């Protein structure tokens, strides 16, 4: 029997939104057996541009796209949705401190969390792309007390995909040869791209890529700073690759994970790996019959433990900052 899903996308007229919507409407996230309603949220000044995007979506005549709602009201956007993809966020501008960005986005995500809590379908799942995504997700989660905490996710799949791409290039193999590439912690420059547990053609990555200096001193910083490198080269932030990673994430959260692999997503820590209860932290995950679970038996060497501490400390600082602002 055909399935149907209602999906809210915030920041729908932005660059990531533009790269995301056409692929969503074509079935790339929810499958070719699932029809889609799109609820598109934008700020008032961007509504004319969003109407242009809607015209283009109509002009594609996607068989799976049933209905579209265009609005600047979060209550309308999140009404009865099964998925909320929180893409829109205030960008960091020159001279802006991270705490300023947290405050500006905090009010946005607090409001959206409340609107989701009051209006979304009972089975809603929330996936945050807008940065700083871990802490924006934390804010939304804390403002939606009626929704189970395990329904909130933040995107680190872009980091995972970046890491897989770099390992494949270095090893001279095709991308599908690289598996179990884990991103731990925050989607920021403190993230820990864990090559120690990655495999290449079924062997430990460290056996295939024997250049330890490259792994430690080139690979990790490249992944941690890839977003900034894209901005420097392109003059704009990652859009198509971010949209692609969001689609990959939704697919992985819904569909059973292959037995020999895992995927990375940030979710509510629930005390795992010594991470504070309630923080949104990226872990290796698997999906089985629609149930998402964290892989819990992974052990870290001293280097890995230090990297986990660095990213955890940053997430604690961000939490404390938004707590002080009264956002959670």
Curated annotation (Swiss-Prot):
Q: Which SUPFAM superfamilies match?
A: LDH C-terminal domain-like, NAD(P)-binding Rossmann-fold domains
Q: Which reaction does it catalyse?
A: (S)-malate + NAD(+) = oxaloacetate + NADH + H(+)
EC number(s)? Answer: 1.1.1.37
Query: Can you supply a Gene Ontology BP term from the record?
Result: malate metabolic process
Active site annotated at which positions?
A: 187 (proton acceptor)
Keyword terms: NAD, Oxidoreductase, Tricarboxylic acid cycle
Q: Name one GO molecular function term.
A: L-malate dehydrogenase (NAD+) activity
Kindly indicate whether the keyword NAD belongs to this entry.
yes
Asked whether the keyword NAD is assigned, the reply is: yes
List residues binding NAD(+): 11-17, 105, 112, 129-131
Q: Which domain of life is it from?
A: Bacteria
Q: Where does substrate bind?
A: 92, 98, 131, 162
Family stated for the protein in its record: Belongs to the LDH/MDH superfamily. MDH type 2 family.
| Function statement | Catalyzes the reversible oxidation of malate to oxaloacetate.
Query: What's this protein's name?
Result: Malate dehydrogenase
Source organism per entry reads Coxiella burnetii (strain CbuG_Q212) (Coxiella burnetii (strain Q212))
| Lineage, top ranks | Bacteria, Pseudomonadati, Pseudomonadota, Gammaproteobacteria, Legionellales
């Amino acid at each position: 029997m055909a399935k149907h899903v209602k999906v809210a996308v915030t920041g729908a007229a932005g660059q990531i939104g533009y790269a995301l919507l056409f692929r969503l409407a074509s079935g790339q996230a929810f499958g070719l057996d699932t029809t889609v309603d799109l609820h598109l949220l934008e700020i008032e000044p961007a509504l004319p541009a969003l109407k242009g995007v809607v015209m283009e979506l109509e002009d594609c005549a996607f068989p799976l796209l049933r209905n579209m709602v265009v609005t600047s009201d979060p209550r309308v956007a999140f009404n009865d949705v099964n998925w909320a993809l929180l893409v829109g966020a205030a960008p960091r501008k020159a001279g802006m401190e991270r705490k300023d960005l947290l405050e500006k986005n905090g009010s946005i995500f607090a409001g959206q969390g409340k609107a989701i809590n009051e209006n979304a379908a009972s089975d809603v799942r929330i996936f945050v792309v807008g940065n700083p995504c871990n802490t924006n997700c934390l804010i939304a989660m804390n403002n939606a007390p009626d929704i189970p905490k395990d329904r909130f996710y933040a995107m680190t799949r872009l980091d995972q995909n970046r890491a897989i791409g770099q390992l494949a290039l270095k090893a001279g193999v095709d991308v599908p040869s690289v598996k179990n590439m884990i991103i731990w912690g925050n989607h920021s420059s403190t993230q820990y791209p864990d090559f120690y547990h990655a495999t290449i053609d079924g062997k430990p990555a460290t056996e295939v890529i024997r250049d330890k200096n490259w792994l430690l001193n080139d690979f990790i910083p490249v992944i941690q700073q890839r977003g900034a490198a894209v901005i420097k080269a392109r003059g704009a932030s990652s859009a198509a690759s971010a949209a692609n990673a969001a689609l990959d994430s939704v697919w992985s959260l819904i569909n059973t994970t292959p037995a020999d692999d895992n995927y990375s997503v940030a979710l509510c820590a629930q005390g795992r790996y010594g991470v504070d209860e309630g923080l949104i932290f990226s872990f290796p995950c698997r999906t089985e019959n629609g149930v998402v679970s964290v892989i819990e038996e992974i052990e870290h060497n001293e280097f890995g433990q230090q990297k986990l501490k660095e990213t955890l400390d940053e997430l604690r600082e961000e939490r404390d900052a938004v707590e002080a602002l009264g956002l959670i």
